[in-house]
């Protein structure tokens, strides 16, 4: 079980790829390691199913908490449903891998990446992507690789290759770029309002590093004696495509050239052409090759018709510079935006529509205890900004059962979330946990960017003080030989014909999120740069329309949103506020009808629907944590009496005791002879004993209405509220 290990010196670190040692029955396997992070990646191929017209590729990323030396917190103490982060890494693997398989491949493929050990200095996701390529090549699956991925961070003015988790949090950029020898094949990024030029420079920087990992994979293949060969595509029967081109090209072209029609009208006309063609084919002789082709495969006609429509649409764009709705290549569809469309029971709402894409977003403000706890390998323990994306069937005029979110919904929600995070206010100025839900009411392309715009509207309507509003646009690119056309704001019918689709979100200052996917084996960085730059005018145009609906965040919150007060106490006094068994903090919350959260750092957040109640709770906590000094004078009420003395609340929540001997200069037989519960008295702190107990005295302290002529000037009194 020795296997072979190849080490690569990579930006001052060593990346190790071990092959031939693990998972011997998998088609191909590699253990890819850097530091103490180890990811086992396997690729397996099985015979394809008959009658399918797509590539059945499954990419899985498995997290095991033993990788971080932890035991799962579930009842069964084992991993259950993959966390959201694992789903996003599945997509990160799938997106650069899928376009690199031959279009004719129909075999079942499964890539499984398992994080076996995690070093907080080395995130596992980009290692898993590179490992997926290596395992696929070792499995001898037809594949236009090698492919590799790296992460690029930005600390100050310097790019950092494969930064640690801590560096990612501190930096202004978190960008993953995947590439092949042909060029860039995938980009995923979150940025702190970075100019387009900086993001493009980072992509170029990352692609140079990708090239080194590609060479390493090629070296491993050579040492293993594996020659990478892409089998020729199976012979395709051209009878039906040729027939459709002659019979339908003109009529399809006429429909595509009617720019004033609606999507429904265009779809109806194309369906009519296909139905008429199907009837014509059914009228042919049984022995006719066209009818034989259609009879042999029920999907042959719709697939060939769709392919012809795609070809004609691409030709119309490349030759005439016109799209199916008559727009120019750089033109955005009509936009409408509104804020506050729902009653204020909903804390904030926004409705955004671009063409037939319509998204309703809502914002809900919560307390720190509403933060999402992360039970995964991410060092971050919680999330305070959540974005959830829903895509019901009715949004595309279809029916299907309502199920839990799939990978697509999770991915789109995460992209829109990433776009907003850089402009959220600092926690110490706005301590709310915020959840935004984007409901896609109608979909005709670019719903994720519609969710970004809807989120901005809802957050501003909720009174969240965003640093800058964010908008987003979906772009497309068609490449035919050396000719390249970039499309702004692609709609649904265009999504399937472009060679690259990418989404860009940001403010007027710069980019906050970027997602770029290819359907070809790679593009030069120069073309990617052109696409990124063309998205900026579209984003700013959309942003201008949004600002017509709401120019700045509302000054006040919804009356139904909780009111929060946040302040800091000495962390060593947290136990004083909580009290034995939580008794003290429970009494405060019950007395003031508030909700109180205390962080380990000493930050206290009080939530209440009544601002006065929150202020009362704050005064109590400040009283509990305020340092009391000997000699200080306070005015307070008698709270209880015991045989040897009386207790006085000198500060909200903080009591001291007057011993019976300190009630008067004269001898006192019974405490009640001098004071009663509820009496207001002025006391001086006589001493604080070694257990922190406050001992008070009335002796020599003038009370209300008494002369203070012979008394020394008291120290400042801390009044009760």
Curated annotation (Swiss-Prot):
GO molecular function, one term: magnesium ion binding
Cofactors named for this entry: Mg(2+)
Gene3D superfamilies linked to this entry: GHMP Kinase, N-terminal domain, K Homology domain, type 1, Nucleic acid-binding proteins
Catalytic activity annotation: RNA(n+1) + phosphate = RNA(n) + a ribonucleoside 5'-diphosphate
Catalytic EC class: transferase
Pfam families: KH_1 (PF00013), PNPase (PF03726), RNase_PH (PF01138), RNase_PH_C (PF03725), S1 (PF00575)
Domain S1 motif: 631-699
Domain KH positions: 562-621
Residues reported to bind Mg(2+): 495, 501
Keyword Transferase: yes
Compartmental location: Cytoplasm
PROSITE patterns: KH_TYPE_1, S1
GO biological process: mRNA catabolic process; RNA processing
Keywords: Cytoplasm, Magnesium, Metal-binding, Nucleotidyltransferase, RNA-binding, Transferase
One GO CC term, this protein: cytosol
Main location class: cytoplasm
Region (Disordered): 700-721
EC number(s) stated in the UniProt entry for this protein: 2.7.7.8
Function per UniProt: Involved in mRNA degradation. Catalyzes the phosphorolysis of single-stranded polyribonucleotides processively in the 3'- to 5'-direction.
Family in the record: Belongs to the polyribonucleotide nucleotidyltransferase family.
Protein known as: Polyribonucleotide nucleotidyltransferase
Organism: Synechococcus sp. (strain CC9311)
Gene: pnp
């Amino acid at each position: 079980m020795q296997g072979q290990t190849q080490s690569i010196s990579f930006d001052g670190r060593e990346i190790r790829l071990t092959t031939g040692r693990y998972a011997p029955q998998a088609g191909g396997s590699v253990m890819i390691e850097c530091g103490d992070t180890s990811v086992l990646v396997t690729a397996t191929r099985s015979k394809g199913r008959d009658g399918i017209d797509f590539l059945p590729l499954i990419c899985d990323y498995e997290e095991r908490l033993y990788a971080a030396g932890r035991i799962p917190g579930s009842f069964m103490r084992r991993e259950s449903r993959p966390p959201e982060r694992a789903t996003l890494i599945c997509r990160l693997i799938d997106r650069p891998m899928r376009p690199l398989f031959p279009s004719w491949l129909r075999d079942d493929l499964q890539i499984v990446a398992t994080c076996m050990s995690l070093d907080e200095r080395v995130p596992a996701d980009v290692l898993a992507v590179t490992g997926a390529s290596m395992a696929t090549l070792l499995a001898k699956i037809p594949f236009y690789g090698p492919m590799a991925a790296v992460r690029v961070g930005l600390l100050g003015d310097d790019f950092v290759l494969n930064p640690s988790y801590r560096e990612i949090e501190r930096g202004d950029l978190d960008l993953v770029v995947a590439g092949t020898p042909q060029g860039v094949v995938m980009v995923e990024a979150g940025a702190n309002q970075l100019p387009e030029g900086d993001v493009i420079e980072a992509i170029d920087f990352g692609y140079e590093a990708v090239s080194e990992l590609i060479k390493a994979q090629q070296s491993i293949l050579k040492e293993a004696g594996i020659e990478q060969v892409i089998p020729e595509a199976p012979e395709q029967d051209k009878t039906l495509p040729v027939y459709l081109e002659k019979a339908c090209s003109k009529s399809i072209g006429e429909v595509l050239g009617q720019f004033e029609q609606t999507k429904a009208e265009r779809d109806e006309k194309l369906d009519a052409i296909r139905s008429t063609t199907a009837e014509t084919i059914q009228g042919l002789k049984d022995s006719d090759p066209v009818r034989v082709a259609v009879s042999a495969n029920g999907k042959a006609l719709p697939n060939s018709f769709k392919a012809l429509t795609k070809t004609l649409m691409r030709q119309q764009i490349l030759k005439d510079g016109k799209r199916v709705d008559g727009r120019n290549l750089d033109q955005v569809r009509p936009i409408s935006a509104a804020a506050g469309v729902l009653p204020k029971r909903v804390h904030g709402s926004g409705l955004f529509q671009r063409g037939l894409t319509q998204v309703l977003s809502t914002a809900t403000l919560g307390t720190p205890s509403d933060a999402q706890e992360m039970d995964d390998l991410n060092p971050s323990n919680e999330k305070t900004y959540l974005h959830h994306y829903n895509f019901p069937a009715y949004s595309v005029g279809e029916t299907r059962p309502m199920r839990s979110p799939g990978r697509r919904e999770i991915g789109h929600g995460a992209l829109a979330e990433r776009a907003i995070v850089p402009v959220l206010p600092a926690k110490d100025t706005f301590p709310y946990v915020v959840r935004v839900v984007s409901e896609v009411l109608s979909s005709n392309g670019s719903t994720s960017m519609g969710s970004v715009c809807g989120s901005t509207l809802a957050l501003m309507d909720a009174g969240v003080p965003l640093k800058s509003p964010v908008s987003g646009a979906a772009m497309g690119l068609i490449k035919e030989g050396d000719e390249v056309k970039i499309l702004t704001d692609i709609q649904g019918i265009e999504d399937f014909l472009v060679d690259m689709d990418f989404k860009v979100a940001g403010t007027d200052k710069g980019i906050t999120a970027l997602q770029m996917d290819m359907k070809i084996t790679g593009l030069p960085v120069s073309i990617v740069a052109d696409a990124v730059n063309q998205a900026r005018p579209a984003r700013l145009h959309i942003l201008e329309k949004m600002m017509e609906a709401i120019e700045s965040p509302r000054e006040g919150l919804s009356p139904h949103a909780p009111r929060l007060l946040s302040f800091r106490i000495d962390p060593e006094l947290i136990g004083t506020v909580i009290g034995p068994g939580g008794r003290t903090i429970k009494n405060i919350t019950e007395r003031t009808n508030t909700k109180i959260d205390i962080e380990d750092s000493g930050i206290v957040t009080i939530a209440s629907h009544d601002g006065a109640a929150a202020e009362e709770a704050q005064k109590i906590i400040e009283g509990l944590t305020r340092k009391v000094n000997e000699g200080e004078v306070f005015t307070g009420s008698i709270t209880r009496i015991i045989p040897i003395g009386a207790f006085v609340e000198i500060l909200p929540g903080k009591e001291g005791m007057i011993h019976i001997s300190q009630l008067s200069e004269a001898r006192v037989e019974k405490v009640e002879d001098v004071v009663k519960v509820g009496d207001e008295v002025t006391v001086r702190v006589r001493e604080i004993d070694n257990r922190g107990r406050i001992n008070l005295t009335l002796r020599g302290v003038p009370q209300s209405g008494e002369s203070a002529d012979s008394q020394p000037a008291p120290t400042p009194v801390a009044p009760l509220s």
